[in-house]
Every structure is written in C-alpha cells, then in structure tokens.
Amino acid sequence: MAGAWLRWGLLLWAGLLAWSAHGRVRRITYVVRPGPGLPAGALPLAGPPRTFNVALDARYSRSSTAASSRALAGPPAERTRRTSQPGGAALPGLRSPLPPEPARPGGPSRQLHSKAGAQTAVTRFAKHGRQVVRSQVQQDAQSAGGSRLQVQQKQQLQGINVCGGQCCHGWSKPPGSQRCTKPSCVPPCQNGGMCLRPQLCVCKPGSKGKACEITAAQDTMPPAFGGQNPGSSWAPLEQAAKHTSTKKADTLPRVSPVAQMTLTLKPKPSMGLSQQIHPQVAPLSSQNVMIRHGQTQEYLLKPKYFPAPKVVSAEQSTEGSFSLRYGQEQGTAPFQVSNHTGRIKVVFTPSICKVTCTKGNCQNSCQKGNTTTLISENGHAADTLTATNFRVVICHLPCMNGGQCSSRDKCQCPPNFTGKLCQIPVLGASMPKLYQHAQQQGKALGSHVIHSTHTLPLTMTSQQGVKVKFPPNIVNIHVKHPPEASVQIHQVSRIDSPGGQKVKEAQPGQSQVSYQGLPVQKTQTVHSTYSHQQLIPHVYPVAAKTQLGRCFQETIGSQCGKALPGLSKQEDCCGTVGTSWGFNKCQKCPKKQSYHGYTQMMECLQGYKRVNNTFCQDINECQLQGVCPNGECLNTMGSYRCSCKMGFGPDPTFSSCVPDPPVISEEKGPCYRLVSPGRHCMHPLSVHLTKQICCCSVGKAWGPHCEKCPLPGTAAFKEICPGGMGYTVSGVHRRRPIHQHIGKEAVYVKPKNTQPVAKSTHPPPLPAKEEPVEALTSSWEHGPRGAEPEVVTAPPEKEIPSLDQEKTRLEPGQPQLSPGVSTIHLHPQFPVVVEKTSPPVPVEVAPEASTSSASQVIAPTQVTEINECTVNPDICGAGHCINLPVRYTCICYEGYKFSEQLRKCVDIDECAQVRHLCSQGRCENTEGSFLCVCPAGFMASEEGTNCIDVDECLRPDMCRDGRCINTAGAFRCEYCDSGYRMSRRGYCEDIDECLKPSTCPEEQCVNTPGSYQCVPCTEGFRGWNGQCLDVDECLQPKVCTNGSCTNLEGSYMCSCHRGYSPTPDHRHCQDIDECQQGNLCMNGQCRNTDGSFRCTCGQGYQLSAAKDQCEDIDECEHHHLCSHGQCRNTEGSFQCVCNQGYRASVLGDHCEDINECLEDSSVCQGGDCINTAGSYDCTCPDGFQLNDNKGCQDINECAQPGLCGSHGECLNTQGSFHCVCEQGFSISADGRTCEDIDECVNNTVCDSHGFCDNTAGSFRCLCYQGFQAPQDGQGCVDVNECELLSGVCGEAFCENVEGSFLCVCADENQEYSPMTGQCRSRVTEDSGVDRQPREEKKECYYNLNDASLCDNVLAPNVTKQECCCTSGAGWGDNCEIFPCPVQGTAEFTEMCPRGKGLVPAGESSYDTGGENYKDADECLLFGEEICKNGYCLNTQPGYECYCKQGTYYDPVKLQCFDMDECQDPNSCIDGQCVNTEGSYNCFCTHPMVLDASEKRCVQPTESNEQIEETDVYQDLCWEHLSEEYVCSRPLVGKQTTYTECCCLYGEAWGMQCALCPMKDSDDYAQLCNIPVTGRRRPYGRDALVDFSEQYGPETDPYFIQDRFLNSFEELQAEECGILNGCENGRCVRVQEGYTCDCFDGYHLDMAKMTCVDVNECSELNNRMSLCKNAKCINTEGSYKCLCLPGYIPSDKPNYCTPLNSALNLDKESDLE
C-alpha cells in the first residue's frame, strides 16, 4: 500500500469550562467541526483502519499581565444571561471578561471571513461576537430592575440553563417538563441536522452551514495544498468578536479559574500502510480570558500558538525549509490523498480539588464538572482548528519510547531519546528547543503539570444506535493537568463509518514528508525507516500471571534458543526481550495485534505491561537475569539500554553487547537469490557483491563455494548485518574509537581528522538528519564533506584532562571539558557524558592560550568527591548535571542559562531581552522558549518571531468569479463577473437564468456558470417555458393491438397478451407459434391457433390440465389390478410385479401362486413339505431344525454352554446328545449334568482313625493325630514316631503304639521326664525337691509347625508355666525351644495342675495342695501378639479375641484373618462373588439386579417401579438437612412415603422439604411404631466397656409411653387388614390403627409393614463374635455357625473347639 498525504483537522466549537462563584459546575458541550476536504478526483485511502490516540491536556495557569492586575480592582460587571455564545460569552454565574467591540470602518455591511475558507463558520463567529456586545448592553439596561428580578426568581424556574428564574436565551422547556433543556436554533436546522445547543446545528454528512442549508453539491471545495504552490499555507479560522477596545481594559472584573483542554487525536499507521501523515497546526486566538474561582486564586488562560508550516516538495524546498522523504528518490513528484474518518465523539468529566484554610482549619473540597462532549462534524477536517481557549490537533506520528506528539509532525521526546519518532537513544545530549516546545507549553508560570493516560476502545455507532462492524480501534487518551485537577474519560466513539482517499502517483512503501522549521542552509534528503513493531498491540496467550517459565531470545522455526538464566513471567518475557516462553516446552510469543473482535481491548505497547484497563506500566527489563551480558543494564521507559564493558560494543538496538567486530571483508563474489534443498545455489545476480551487501539484502548464499547466509535474528546475522536487513555499514563505520587506559579510566580519543568547532549559536535543524535505527553504532564518520560539528558538553574555558600523557596542552579553539569528564562520541548530535573515578591530573596551558609565557601547573590533590548529580538528579532543573572535582556544573537545555547564584538552569526571558519580538502580536515568555500570540488574520512567520498578515486572496478558491481584496487581518469580495451576483455570505454566486419561464419558451433551458443555453427537446418530448414535457402516445388509437400500452418518459411500451410477443421496439404485438417449441404436446400432435395452440393425444394418454401436454394414464390407480403383487405403470400401459411365491400370468394382468412342494424336490429334505399361499412350510422331527427352509438338519446340543457341566463331556448324537462324566461323577436324572458322587456316605471308607471329607469328584480322609493317610488316600494308618523322629526319646527306649509312642527307661527305678527328655529317678511328692526351677524366665514361642518359628515369639522374659499353661507352644532362648507338653498329658498336668489359664502366684483364691494360683492375664502378658488385628479381652481362665466383622480368629497363628464369604454359595446366588477385606461384593450380569438382601441376582420386574397397594403418596426423600434448614442429597433411584423416608433414609421429605421428627423424640417413635430406646451402645472394641452412665440398659425398650400401649392384643390375620397378615409376627391394634409385633429373629419393615428376617451375622456380629472359631451363616429367623477347618463343634452353643483338643479329651475320657 503506497503512502499518502493526509489532511485532517477538527474545529473545537466550545464555550468556557468554568466553576461558578457559588461552587456549581456548568454543563458545557463541545462540538468538533471538520475542516474542508480535498478536491474532486482525490481517491479514498484504502487499507486497514487507523488507530487514534486522543490526548486531553488540561492546564491551569496564573495571570501575570498588567491587565489582570488592573482587573482585580475594577468594579464587577453585570451578569450576562447569554450562555450559548461561543468564543466570548461567559457562563451563567460568571462575570463577562470581554469588553464590547468598537465599530469597524465600513459599517455593519462588511463581511469577515475565516482563514480556513469555511464560509458558514465565519458568519457565525461574527454574529456571535455582535451578540456578546448586545448582551452586555442589555445587561446594563436591566441592572436597574435587579431587585424586581430577584423577587421573581423565588417563584420561577431553577436548574441548568436558567437565567433570572427563566430559561436562558436560546433555551426552552420541552413539553411536560419544567427544566430548560431544549435548545433552539434560528433559523431551524435543515437537511436532517440536529440543534445541539442554541444557534448551533450538528449537520449530517453531506451538508454544512449554520442551518445545514448547504449541501455537498453546492459547496466549493478548496484545492489541496501541497507541492504545487510553495507560497500558500493552510491558515486557521479567524476568531470571532475581536475585543480590541482598551477603554474598559482597566475595569475588567476578578476572574475565576479556567480549564484549558487540548484534545489531540493521533492516528497510528497500520502495518500494511507505509506512510508518514502530518497534520497542520494553526494559531489560536490571541485574547486572554480570565474567570473568577472563589475569592483567593486567579488564573490566566493563555491560548497556545503553533506555527502553520508549509508543505513543499523536495524540488521546491527553499531556504528555511527542508523535506524528509521515505523510500523515494529525490525528484519524484509528490502524491496527494485526503482522509475521511467520520465524526468522533469524546465524553469526559473534569474536576478540581483544593484545600481551603480558615483560621488554621483546613478542609478538602472537590468540584466536579458536568459531563462534557466533543463531537466532530461532517467527517471532513483540517489539520488543526481552534476555538476560544481550546485547541484540537490531529497528529499522525507514532512517537516511540515514551514520546508524545505535540503538534503537526513533531514528537516531544524524553531527554534520553531523539529523532523524528524518538527512536534514537542518546546520552547526555541537550534537547533541541523545538523538541521541548510542546513540553514547555504545558508549564505555565510556576505551575507543575502531571500526565495521566487512559486507554479506551474507539467504539463505532450509527445514527440509529446500531453498532457498525469495523475492526476495533483503541484510543490512548493522554491527560495533562495540574496535580489538583483530574479528567475522567467516559467514552470515545466514532459516530459515522470511516472513509478515505486512495493514493495516487506513489509506489508501495513510499511516502514523502516535508517540514518547515528554523532556517537551515540547504535541503537535506535522507532515507530512514522505523519499525512498526512497537505500534502493534500484543494479545498474550492465556496463562496464569504468577506462572514462571524460561524466556528465550531467539526463535527459528520451532526451535527456541538463547534462554535467559532463571525464570520469569510470560508478560515480562514476551513484553520485552523474549520471542518465546515456556517451562517444559516453549511457545512463541504472539504478535501484538487486536483485530479479532470489535470490543476487544488492545494490549500495551512493547516494553509495557497492563496494570488495569486504563494503565500500562513499564517493564524493568534489567530485573530479568541474563539481560545485557558483558555490560550493565539501564532501564528506560518501554525499553532498556546496555552499557558495555571494555572490548564490547552495543548492537544497533543498544539491547546487547557484542564483541568488537572485525574488519568486514571487501572481497566480492557471486550473490545467489535462491538455495535449493540440495544446497545448490540458483539465480545469481548479474554483478558481484560483497558478502555483507549480499546477505544483508536479497541474497540467500554468497561466494564461489555457495556459503549460505545466516538467518535473520541470529547472532551471526547481527555480526555481519548490524544495521538489520536492508542496511549495510561501511568499514569505516565499523571501526571503534581508540581505547586508552589511565588507571581505571576508559577515554575515547577523537580521530585526527575531526575538526573541532565552537558551540553553535543557533539551534540544530528540525528534524535532525536521521540514520536508520539499526545502523546506529559507536563509530566515527569520515568522508569528503569533512567531520560533522561536535556538540560540546561544557563551556570552552574549562580544562581537559590528559589523554595520552601526564600533561595536556590546551589548543585555542578546541572544545574543552571539565576535569573528570570525557565524551563518548557516538554521533555528532548524540554525545554521551561519562564520569571518571581518577583524581585530576596536572594540566599545562599552551602559550597561545595563556597571557604568561610560563606554563601553569596544577599539582594533583587527593580529594573525596561528592557526586551532587547522583545525590540530586534534578539539581540542574532544565539541564544536564556534570559532576566536577569541586561542586558541579550544568549543561542547560536551549532556552535556559546557568545561574551561578542559584546553581541551576533558569529560563531566558526572550520577550524582555529581544526588542520588537513578535511584531503585530504579543510575545509571551514560556519555560525555555517564547510564544508569539498573533491576532486573528495574522500568522506566525517562518522563524516564529513575528506576526505577518495572511493574504487570503492568494488562495485560488477565494472570491471565485469575483475580485478578492486583501485587508489587514481579513479580506472581502467585490465586483462579481457577468452572470454572477454577490450572495449574503459575501461570495459571488451564479445567477440561474432558467428560473425565468420566458428565457426558453419552446426549448429546454440549461443553466451554465455565468450564462445559460436553450436546447431543443428530444423525440417524445415537447418544449414549454424552458422545460421538456413528455408526450403520452397511449392516447392515440390502435396503439399496442393485442396488448396494453404503458406511457414512458419520452416514449411508450406495449405489454402483450398471452400468446403474443412484443416486437423488438416494443411498439407492436405479434402471434407466437407455440408448436415451434419442442416441449409442447409430448406423446401427441400440436396445432397452432391465433394466440394459442391445441394438442391431440394418442392411446394410453390424456390431455393435461394445462392443455399443453399429453400425460400418461395411470392404470395402477385401479385397486383390483395385480393382486398379490404391485402394479407398475408404464408409458401408455402397465405391468404386474408379483410378490415372492407368485408369478405373473400369461397375459400379465394378475399374479398366480407357485407350488414349491411340487416344483422343487430339494425343499424340506428330512421333513414334511406343506404348500401355503405364496410360500411353503417345513415340519422337522425332534432333535432337528430347519435349515434355510430347505431341509431338516440335526441340532448340536453340545454347542449349548454349560451342558453336562464342567465335570462331563457332551457327545452329540443324531437328534439327541449324551453326557460322559469324569471319574467320581455320575449323570443326573435329567441327563444334562454330571453330579459329584459322595463317597463319604460309606462310613467305613476312612475306618475309625479319621473322618471322611468329600471333594469334587473324589474324597479325602482327615486322620486323627498319630495317624496319616496312605498314598492311595484310602483309610488312616498309624504313624511310627520312633522311626520318623530319630532320638525322640533320647537315651530311653522308644515304643510305638497306635496313634502315639512311649518312651521306656531301661532302669525300672527311673522314669522318663518329658520336660527334660531324660530318665530320672523316681521321687515322691513329699521329698521336697523341686521338679524344675520355677523362676527361670525365657522366651515364649507359638506355632512351632511354622517354617519361621524362631520369629513366632509371644513374649520375652516369661516363666515356663506362664508360657505353657496359657497359649505358648514352646519355651526357650535363641530359638533353642523346649516344646510345651500337650494338654491332657501327665507332663501338662504336672506343669499346670490347675489347667490352662492358671499360673502359680503368691496369693490366690485357688488354694490346692498348699500352692496359690491366679488367672493369667494373657492380654497383658503377651500384648498384641496374642490377638493380632483384633481386640483381646481377658477371661477367667483364658481370654477372648474379638475380630472385626468379616474376619475370624485363628488360634494357631493368634491372628484375625479375612473370612472368604464367597465360599458360601448363599452369599451371591446367580451372581459373581468377589471377596474383599472384611466383606465381599456381589456383581450381577446385566440386566439382572440385586434384590433387597443384596445376596441374590434377580430379573427386574415392573412391580418394583409400581406403587404397592399399602403405600400412600410418594415423593423425594432428602438424606441431609443443613443447619439453615436447606434440603440436600436427594435419595437417588426411588421415591418414598413420608413414613418410609423419615424412619429409614432421610431427614426431610417432599418438594416442600417437610422436616422429619427428631429420632429421639416421641413423635418419631409414634411415626415409626418403635419404642423410645435412648442412645445406642457402640460396637467394636469398646463394646464390653461399662457405659451404664451414658447409655440405657442393654435390653430394649427401656421406656415406652402409655399412650403407645393402649391395646396390643393379638388379632387374627384377616382382621389385621395388612398385606400377608403379619407373617413371622402377630398383628396388634394400636391407637393409630394396626401394626405387626414381629417374632424373635425378625424386625418390622415400615415401608411394607411386614416382618423380615434379621441378618444376625451382619447386624449383630460387629458387636461381638456370635460364632467362636466358626463362620456365621444367616438363616430364616436365626443363624447357624459353621466351624472353620481344623475345628469341630463343641457342647457349648456356637463354639467350635480345635480338633486336637477334642481328641485328647476323648482319650482322657476313655482312660477314665
């Protein structure tokens, strides 16, 4: 997209924003009017929409003029009632600051015209100015009736726009309202215009004028300014109502504060539009307006002035101007373009806060203004238009690095940046005066101005309020205001759709910019580029703001490189130096674009991050680790800069330090534009280039060996192309200054050919010559033009320290620096001041620079420097601080001078020092500069030092068709040409001669500029009084026969009837031969008739309803055709399609049945065939099935799963099957399964030494102790322990007996001791000798049959009786175990005379044989080892181990193990049982479900979903009720009655959340038919603890109220009225009706009112074990115990004893 000139401007038509004396704030509406557009022929600007930055600058200033001082003492003027007068009228409540305007020579007939050429605006200014004078006179006349007016105000209107109790002039009340809110415009607004405020019409696009009476066709647009006329300039509009009288200057009243708002709209160029657009700046009014604010402070409003520059081309540049061209060679003609952006509205509210102190008491008070609106009109605008005290500038420059667009084409840069766009960093350079102009304009006399930024979307709405879909625009609103003031931005919206003009005579990427600034010697044309990257908004990926990741500085393809050390946030990385970011994997940082949605907010610029919706904060890049390697990082606004170490230099962007580059080779070679995937170089250029020029431009490879060029963005690319793509740096530019070291100093030596110059007395040209941003390096420029001027940083009289020797000779005329200061000469216009740390060195003054012939030597001194510049950075004010060995000095900015007394930079008052400055105007001194305020009709000179008259007559559009006479500050039109006359607006307008009927009585009159022409009328018209009237031919007879006639303008047309067509001239109708058309009378004959045709159809066809076709007759509509088939219609006939089993007859008109049994002998083989209508049936015998309806085949029953079971094999036979069972199984009675043979039915199978245990398909013999089963498993045989256990009797003789063995001693006087395993002498009981030491303590072992028996230690340090008389199986130390004697043997009786569980004690209630015994507390003695995973309870004698539900106690391993419930077939009937720890799960196969017992899988029936007969209304049941009585957790899967819900499941019922009674209340017992039981005892390990104080008695119930026991007599089942008559219980009558009293083992189901079985194994087994050493199995109404393996039932109920113990007891009983 080619660049373009853009002319844009807004006129701010505004009153004054002021605070009244009573503290109220008036509402003021500002309308931004457009200026003229471009002439016809200019094309609209294409491309994406532009973004505007809107800046509101509010400034409060104090008056310092003599006139304001005299105004304080003057008498108060009368209050004016006219608030609608722009430019001069004061607000209600404010005194008029303007004196009346004296009469001008020439009388009132003289017309004043604006500078911009907008005729309507000039008249309005003049009229308003006169109204102000008349208003003042009226006020003086009404002052006598002030008292009478005050009485009327009490009874009349109040509020806004009320003057003296009535609506102010220009305001009225809407119907039905008592507020003055309706403005009036006289004359009324035309062409759809809107009366915005009194006498101000807002016109629609295409119209303008005071009353919008001028349309676009009547408006004469001025030609575009540009390079065609160097002497022309775009002047501003003239201020209306010049008040130049000095008669009342001494009587001006006291003034109030005024807010000066400066609105700046800044369109940003888009990426696709390479252009530089420059607005123009026009002067403001020259008058000062003073308004009262309270009674203490006074402010003076000073309108700003900005020079209106000329626009010239490069060829037409003269002295005093120069041009800057982008991408275009010198000599190319400029191009022109205009812009149409539509109307823009800005809504804001100003406010000001102050502190009022009275007698030491201070209070804060804030006054807030009404909502203020600024609107642009008509969509066309000049660059800068002004109104009283307001200025609107449209700025198109994208100022970077914190710069602000001040006016026209100037960026106000911060001190450390310069250049056209503030894109060039600079260290220590003085700021040019014109760059400081905008900043210093914001500083009033002694006032302090602060900035605030608001970012808002630029919304777009049509006039009907419907949103227009355009890409989003974001507006940055910069508000410049004093600290006590603030501005709140509400809305920035575009009212109309944007438009523009296309670019002409330009190439893509080219644009030309011309400037006019201070005088320079010649025109300089340079090439410059700037990056748009900082202007594109960024939309970051959605990520957590606190998430950290790695930051990558290079991204090539999908590879990320140059990762910074440490972690950082995504917004800090992508907003500054990073190109990718991530932790585990990297992702590219998205580009800053925001055109995805209309209302989407744009992100902050590069280098900033968003704090909130309206504020962007600078990112401190120096906090990121790894930034500026080989250097020190210095943070700047929106960026950062690297100060490099010795041996390194900054890259072109000053963002990194690179090693000193080598000298670039000047060797030339071929440059290739393409490299194929196979590394073949293609498309060489016709000339040989250096590698730098090739790779930095269009080349992809270079040299005879096809060396690939480095990729852009890599370090290798930056080394060879430091200026970036498209830029090369010559070898002389790559050389760095010479480094010389003096101690810790690093001083840069100036080259020899650099010529020193004195300090320039005039400011440098603006803008300065710019180099590309990428090409800025620390280098020196050498060339045939000589060295560039050097900017010195200190006065010439200072001394320079030595660079290469101990003494330095000062040459006359050389620039000199202060001691301790040196200069890094990066560029002639960008010096950098660095501080030195070494002490001063001796300096020798040359003879030429000294009056004495002797050299003066300054001895070195050792001092401690205090760097005042670091301690107080603002010590110099408007200047740069330079630290010296003694104190400091200041290098002041232009417009300032150094004050030795104040030690700072003070402003130079140019107005006082320069005489005759600002002639024809008024000079106003500003901070660092001055301002010429020119009156209306004058403009600033090119130098900005004088006011010169604007010759409006030089404009070709002024006084067109007449004579223009220029006057001082104005112009007038006289002597109109022939055919023209003077209009009321003062212009010559054409006379329309055609308005007279007699001008052309028989011809058409055509008006021309200045004349007219009579033209004869064409055919079909006749002339009459200058107009051509149509002739109605339809009135003539015989016109349009066979049709109707329609008269047209100048002709007629025939509309023909059906069957006729018009002739080519549409003046006649002719017959149509329809038969020539091929689509008529198909299947028939066509005959044409007059205006129609006729069809004759053949057999089988009939005429259609439209009579134009022969249609087929559908015979199939008759239902009797084709029975047993389908009738298919054909052309002229039909056919029958018969069903399967039928066939068509010979004639084809019906279907006949096919006898398959006779015609097909292959059907029903092995069976009987029976013919049916349309088919046949086959009947097969048993054991056979039909195969594809062709024959009978055998059924393979063995294919059915589960047939013959898992212990049989199915054998298929013809028509049947047979089961062959395995050994140990026999076929069942139905012959379908194999059943197990119970061999244990024969009692003799295992003889008398064991018992039989049947197994699947076999059996086994479980032998008693001392017996074992043989290899064949038949019976039990004795075990010979003497052979099996070698040495079991030691020295004694082992004798085997049946089931056991005996140890016999050889000496008859000895007996075998099983405790010691030796034979000992027989002793009597009264011998007094202890059989064994009783007090010896060792370890007690259990389960000696375990392989790891050494680890089975019950307890250490116990006696043998404590071990063997309780639960121990062995006793000893270090796994040397002595087995405990078996219970029931003589050894056991000898050791434990009182049996198991009793051990000897000192004192005991058991006293037998003189020894005391006590109960052994096994739980205390052995701890957790005796009852693992369970609860141990000591008993007398013995102990009990209580296991958790679902587990059982193993007395051998002394541990609670999980019970496998799945071994019980009743645990999960017809389902799959899965055992779990302490329980089990029963899974059913779909669609089967668990029944209520959760032990059986059943088929779901509809009865489960139906409401049973005994149920009442069902609803939701809520399982939980919160403390706030909120129902939650509804019961899923079923609805319940109120009783069922409250008694079984939940806490509330129904959609109304009806609460259930408390479970311990009487209502709950009554509802659920249960007695009150109190608190239940807990289950588990604490079940046997005494809780008598906390709980009721064990037996339930413990209390029943009498009202629940009225009558519990038993009734018969038929009398009960309950379903099933209370089975398993008895029916009793209660007060509420009937209920069931269930038998033991059953409980009442309240839902079904039936007695259901109590599962004691699950409900009671958790309190204590119901079955000891057995498994609990629930039965109907009770339960049973099934002994575990190794246990047999005992005589105790629900108790199983070990098998060994039972056998021993049986032997003892047999012996007895």
Swiss-Prot record:
Residues 1498-1712 are annotated as: C-terminal domain. The keyword Secreted applies. GO terms for cellular component: collagen-containing extracellular matrix; extracellular matrix; extracellular region; microfibril. Belongs to the LTBP family. Pfam families: EGF_CA (PF07645), TB (PF00683). The gene is Ltbp1. This is Latent-transforming growth factor beta-binding protein 1. Residues 1335-1402 are annotated as: 8-Cys3 region. Residues 549-601, 669-721, 1338-1392, 1515-1568 form the TB domain. The modification (3R)-3-hydroxyasparagine is found at N966, N1129. Contains hydroxylated asparagine residues. Two intrachain disulfide bonds from the TB3 domain are rearranged upon TGFB1 binding, and form interchain bonds with TGFB1 propeptide, anchoring it to the extracellular matrix. GO terms for molecular function: calcium ion binding; growth factor binding; receptor ligand inhibitor activity. Key regulator of transforming growth factor beta (TGFB1, TGFB2 and TGFB3) that controls TGF-beta activation by maintaining it in a latent state during storage in extracellular space. Associates specifically via disulfide bonds with the Latency-associated peptide (LAP), which is the regulatory chain of TGF-beta, and regulates integrin-dependent activation of TGF-beta. Outcompeted by LRRC32/GARP for binding to LAP regulatory chain of TGF-beta. It is found in: Secreted; Secreted, Extracellular space, Extracellular matrix. The keyword Signal applies. Disulfide bonds join C185-C195, C189-C201, C203-C212, C395-C405, C399-C411, C413-C422, C551-C573, C560-C586, C574-C589, C622-C633, C628-C642, C644-C657, C671-C694, C681-C706, C695-C709, C696-C721, C869-C881, C876-C890, C892-C905, C911-C923, C918-C932, C934-C947, C953-C964, C959-C973, C976-C988, C994-C1005, C1000-C1014, C1017-C1028, C1034-C1045, C1040-C1054, C1056-C1069, C1075-C1086, C1081-C1095, C1097-C1110, C1116-C1127, C1122-C1136, C1138-C1151, C1157-C1169, C1164-C1178, C1180-C1192, C1198-C1210, C1204-C1219, C1221-C1234, C1240-C1252, C1246-C1261, C1263-C1276, C1282-C1294, C1289-C1303, C1305-C1319, C1340-C1363, C1350-C1375, C1364-C1380, C1365-C1392, C1419-C1432, C1427-C1441, C1443-C1456, C1462-C1473, C1468-C1482, C1484-C1497, C1517-C1541, C1527-C1553, C1542-C1556, C1543-C1568, C1616-C1627, C1622-C1636, C1638-C1651, C1657-C1672, C1667-C1681, C1683-C1696. Residues 1-23 form the signal peptide. It comes from Mus musculus (Mouse). Residues 65-118, 753-799 are annotated as: Disordered. The 8-Cys3 region in the third TB domain mediates the interchain disulfide bond interaction with the Latency-associated peptide chain (LAP) regulatory chain of TGFB1. Interacts with TGFB1; associates via disulfide bonds with the Latency-associated peptide chain (LAP) regulatory chain of TGFB1, leading to regulate activation of TGF-beta-1. LTBP1 does not bind directly to TGF-beta-1, the active chain of TGFB1. Interacts (via C-terminal domain) with FBN1 (via N-terminal domain). Interacts with FBN2. Interacts with ADAMTSL2. Interacts with EFEMP2. Residues 181-213, 391-423, 618-658, 865-906, 907-948, 949-989, 990-1029, 1030-1070, 1071-1111, 1112-1152, 1153-1193, 1194-1235, 1236-1277, 1278-1320, 1415-1457, 1458-1498, 1612-1652, 1653-1697 form the EGF-like domain. Keywords: Disulfide bond, EGF-like domain, Extracellular matrix, Glycoprotein, Growth factor binding, Hydroxylation, Phosphoprotein, Repeat, Secreted, Signal. GO terms for biological process: aorta development; coronary vasculature development; sequestering of TGFbeta in extracellular matrix; transforming growth factor beta receptor signaling pathway; ventricular septum development. Glycans are attached at residues 339, 370, 416, 612, 639, 761, 793, 929, 1011, 1042, 1051, 1133, 1216, 1242, 1357, 1479, 1678. The modification Phosphoserine is found at S1405, S1588, S1607.
